[in-house]
């Protein structure tokens, strides 16, 4: 049914008593990833990319190109350079097409205030207002303009010869690995068959075929001859499942790896590297399922000395993910005991000094400095493909926890001083506190006229009487149960269940033997 347009006088009308607060579970969470646009990142893209290896490096560079227009060209070029070390021809073609489209889209629209070399680098159109030519500078400009694009063209132009060569090599290697696996199966050597499946899966992974790689890694399970082989198979499946973002599969194989006899019975020191890898994978899966407190505990259990798997996650990621989730969900005691006083996680925080300062300032109740530092690292977090969809939620939880901790010792608080402490306006702060009161996180009332927040005074006398009555009822119930048990023991009364045949008999026998009588009285119940 078509919607009729509103009259011009009613389009800007606002109904009275309208509360300007968005519903908490609207489509904002589902579309958050699509709305991310990062304008001012402060990361060194080369250093960032070198923390990872394999497909995860390509995925992260592609994500940077998606959300950050400033780094898009550089990220795509780095991804193209790296993908040429693999057999992933399809991804090379996709990346090159995106780079070509990006360059074609940027060339006709140079910045309005660009001048000098930037203006000369853009391809002039027939309608462009060109200044008078500088005859003396033309030979130099032409030489520079011819030399620089030549190098760039050689490095990032579409290489059809490389595509054909890689496709042929990939096909030959696949045929060889497949024939080797058939020979191993004909010889019925389990260890060789297991290795053959792993080699075939590694090749599929290099070609970017994640589905077939997952199938081959999973098939190796039937040919594992030791617990170590089972754990290795589980780790491979977990790795590919993370690439596919199948988090339920990740958690399932983490449980299988932890229940392997050799891993469960072995010492924690002997399996420290595998344990750390499983904890990081579990933390990543719980983070994506928005179980932030569980994710924080998994990341905090990681061992810094054994955290070396760039094909999945970096040590800096462990610090950032674990630190932010802990800030958003831990109380002061947990934050002190599990994060600040943790000798293991302290090594992770050394890699992220800004995050370390944020945690310490939050614990010291310096909320203005803490929130300012959080805003400074926000853009860098938004270029991380795993934490970016959760940044808004985590920041909101951290801010709400800071408000709760700030107000908890007081019976009343001046909202003007609170607004100064949180770098906010009084109106915005009042809306935040109102939402916390509605959610039941703060027991308080707002004096909107004087801008004062009053804590609700609980009647200690009534609450004490209520607790006393509840405890009295519990004691009475326990006492009656004890008296009944003592009477049954004194009368030699006990209940014997009858074996059920075919599931039709649900009865039991109550045997009562009084005194020294040898005859038992049976009653059917």
Curated annotation (Swiss-Prot):
Protein origin, superkingdom: Eukaryota
One Pfam family cited in the UniProt record for this chain: PCI
GO terms under cellular component: COP9 signalosome; cytoplasm
GO BP, one annotated term: germ cell development
Q: Which residues form the PCI domain?
A: 298-460
Q: Tell me the InterPro entries matching this sequence.
A: CSN1_C, PCI_dom, Rpn7/CSN1, Rpn7_N, WH_DNA-bd_sf
List where in the cell it is found. Cytoplasm; Nucleus
Q: Which UniProt keywords apply?
A: Cytoplasm, Developmental protein, Differentiation, Nucleus, Oogenesis, Signalosome
| Reported function | Essential component of the COP9 signalosome complex (CSN), a complex involved in various cellular and developmental processes. The CSN complex is an essential regulator of the ubiquitin (Ubl) conjugation pathway by mediating the deneddylation of the cullin subunits of the SCF-type E3 ligase complexes, leading to decrease the Ubl ligase activity of SCF. The CSN complex plays an essential role in oogenesis and embryogenesis and is required for proper photoreceptor R cell differentiation and promote lamina glial cell migration or axon targeting.
Q: Which PANTHER family match?
A: 26S PROTESOME SUBUNIT 6 (PTHR14145), COP9 SIGNALOSOME COMPLEX SUBUNIT 1 (PTHR14145:SF2)
The entry assigns this protein to a family as follows:
Belongs to the CSN1 family.
Subunit info here reads: Component of the CSN complex, probably composed of CSN1b, alien/CSN2, CSN3, CSN4, CSN5, CSN6, CSN7 and CSN8.
Name-wise, this protein is: COP9 signalosome complex subunit 1b
> Gene name, please?
CSN1b
């Amino acid at each position: 049914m078509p919607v009729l347009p509103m009259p011009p006088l009613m389009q800007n009308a606002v109904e009275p008593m309208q509360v300007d607060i968005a519903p908490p579970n609207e489509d904002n969470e589902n579309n958050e990833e699509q709305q991310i646009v990062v304008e001012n990142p402060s990361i060194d893209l080369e250093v960032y990319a070198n923390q990872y290896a394999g497909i995860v490096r390509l995925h992260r560079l592609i994500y940077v190109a998606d959300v950050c227009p400033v780094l898009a060209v550089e990220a795509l070029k780095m991804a193209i350079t790296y993908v040429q070390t693999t057999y992933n021809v399809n991804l090379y073609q996709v990346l090159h097409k995106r780079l070509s489209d990006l360059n074609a889209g940027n060339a006709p629209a140079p910045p309005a205030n660009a001048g000098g070399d930037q203006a000369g680098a853009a391809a002039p159109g027939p309608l462009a207002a060109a200044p008078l030519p500088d005859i003396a500078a033309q030979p130099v400009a032409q030489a520079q303009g011819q030399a620089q694009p030549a190098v760039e063209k050689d490095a990032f132009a579409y290489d059809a010869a490389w595509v054909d060569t890689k496709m042929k090599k990939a096909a030959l290697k696949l045929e060889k690995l497949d024939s080797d696996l058939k020979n191993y199966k004909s010889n019925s050597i389990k260890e060789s068959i297991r290795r053959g499946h792993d080699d075939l899966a590694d090749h599929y992974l290099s070609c970017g075929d994640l589905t077939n790689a997952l199938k081959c890694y999973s098939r190796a399970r039937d040919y594992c001859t030791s617990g170590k082989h089972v754990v290795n198979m589980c780790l491979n499946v977990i790795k590919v499942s993370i690439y596919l973002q199948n988090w339920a599969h990740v958690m399932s194989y983490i449980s299988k790896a932890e229940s392997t006899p050799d891993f469960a019975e072995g010492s924690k020191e002997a399996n420290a590297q595998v344990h750390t890898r499983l904890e990081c994978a579990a933390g990543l899966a719980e983070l994506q399922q928005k179980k932030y407190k569980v994710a924080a505990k998994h990341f905090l259990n990681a061992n810094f000395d054994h955290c070396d798997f760039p094909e999945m996650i970096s040590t800096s990621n462990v610090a950032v993910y674990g630190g932010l989730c802990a800030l958003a969900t831990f109380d002061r005691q947990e934050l002190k005991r599990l994060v600040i006083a943790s000798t293991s996680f302290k090594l992770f925080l050394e890699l992220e000094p800004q995050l370390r300062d944020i945690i310490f300032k939050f614990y010291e109740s310096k909320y203005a400095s803490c929130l300012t530092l959080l805003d400074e690292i926000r853009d860098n977090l938004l270029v991380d493909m795993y934490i970016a969809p959760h940044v808004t939620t985590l920041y909101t939880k951290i801010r709400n926890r800071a408000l709760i901790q700030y107000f908890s010792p007081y019976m009343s608080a001046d909202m003007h001083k609170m607004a100064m402490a949180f770098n906010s306006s009084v109106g915005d702060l009042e809306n935040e506190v109102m939402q916390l009161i509605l959610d039941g996180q703060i027991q308080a009332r707002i004096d909107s006229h004087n801008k004062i927040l009053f804590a609700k005074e609980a009647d200690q006398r009534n609450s004490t009487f209520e607790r006393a009555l509840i405890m009295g009822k519990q004691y009475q119930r326990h006492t009656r149960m004890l008296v009944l048990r003592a009477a049954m023991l004194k009368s030699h009364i006990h209940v014997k269940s009858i074996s059920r045949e075919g599931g039709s008999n649900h009865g039991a026998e109550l045997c009562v033997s009084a005194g020294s009588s040898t005859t038992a009285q049976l009653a059917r119940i």
